[in-house]
Amino acid sequence: MSLTNKLSIKDLDLKNKRVFIRVDFNVPLDGTTITNNQRIVAALPSIKYAIDQGAKAVILASHLGRPNGQRVEKYSLKPVQAELSKLLGKPVTFLDDCVGPKVEEEVSKAKDGEVILLENLRFHPEEEGSHKDADGKKIKADPAKVEEFRKSLTSLADVYVNDAFGTAHRAHSSMVGIELPQRAAGFLVAKELEFFAKALEHPERPFLAILGGAKVSDKIQLIDNLLDKVNALIIGGGMAFTFKKTLENVKIGNSLFDEDGSKIVAGLVEKAKKNNVKLVFPVDYVTADKFSKDAKVGHATDAEGIPDGWQGLDCGPKSIEEFQKVIGESKTILWNGPPGVFEFDNFAKGTKAVLDACVKAVDNGATVIIGGGDTATVAKKYGAEDKLSHVSTGGGASLELLEGKTLPGVAALSEKK
């Protein structure tokens, strides 16, 4: 599946059309107060574009939280209405359901670019295709009802736009079940696809991936897929210790060791050799006597190893130097996972140094892509989001793309003619 050949909102004629936009308004709430409106702000370009192009109505659908297929008041999208209205500078109509005759009737009356926000899609088990019973067991939704749910959503509009990249790895009804002739990517999704295509389909070389995170076994598919694509791979974070101990018998003290992951280390290194991929590991460490922000801080190198009772929580100055050098030599950089426990100030130096090197690389003409999740949090924490080429909004979705999987929400989009 090519990521670059999908229909985009700009390819559509929206005049006098009812435009259904699947957005991601899964915002953090404190009661009914939105504590971070970033996801709403991110959806504005597609919404405004549809209005400016003369759409008859813009119908917005999203999920919020995990209500498990039932109506749960604290997961209502109602609080988004006022915030969205304020940001758009125009009224927004809120409907207290997302399907059914009442909703269909309200939407059919809309005109003059009216913006309609539907209630949480996940109040219906038919959105996710299942719900959990009291014992946490998965109960599949009735296929006939799923079909009916999808038909009702489809009947609301003339064209479909998907702008919820964070949910693109889920084959949910609002992602794959709206059978309109034209299904296009919104601006957000189009940008995600453009940058991931840049890295995965036609990278400017040298191409470097920086991986962090705790367990090797969680990242097997990711490492395996990237070894077919990159020229160099930095392996940092907790999972570096599994490689170091297995390959070089470095003493790692109480640092993370992934028993299952250790069994596949040799195979991954073999593949890297075969594909001529340079593997870069840390060679020194900032250590702690416990996993805590106020732990005692120590230092260790490969030669002496980490003493028992201590654990490595960040990479040391020599490693930082080596990482910066490799980053500086690269033209395309994909970063997924921090090299240290950046949440604790004493162990954030390595992560900050890698970020600074990435920002510098962008200044020197490289493309740097941050793959969502914790690494996106790093960029936000240090105010670097607009200094990088692209910070992905989808943790799970970007990870699955990088693992070489097809995303259902992307596969469901129409191809450009």
UniProtKB/Swiss-Prot annotation:
Needed cofactors: Mg(2+)
UniProt catalytic activity: (2R)-3-phosphoglycerate + ATP = (2R)-3-phospho-glyceroyl phosphate + ADP
Residue positions binding ADP: 213, 237, 342
Mitochondrion among keywords: yes
Binding site for CDP: 213, 218, 237, 337, 342
A Pfam cross-reference name: PGK
Location(s), subcellular: Cytoplasm; Mitochondrion
Entry-linked InterPro entries: Phosphoglycerate_kinase, Phosphoglycerate_kinase_CS, Phosphoglycerate_kinase_N, Phosphoglycerate_kinase_sf
Oligomer status and interactors: Monomer.
Family from the record: Belongs to the phosphoglycerate kinase family.
Protein name according to UniProt: Phosphoglycerate kinase
Originating organism: Yarrowia lipolytica (strain CLIB 122 / E 150)
Gene: PGK1
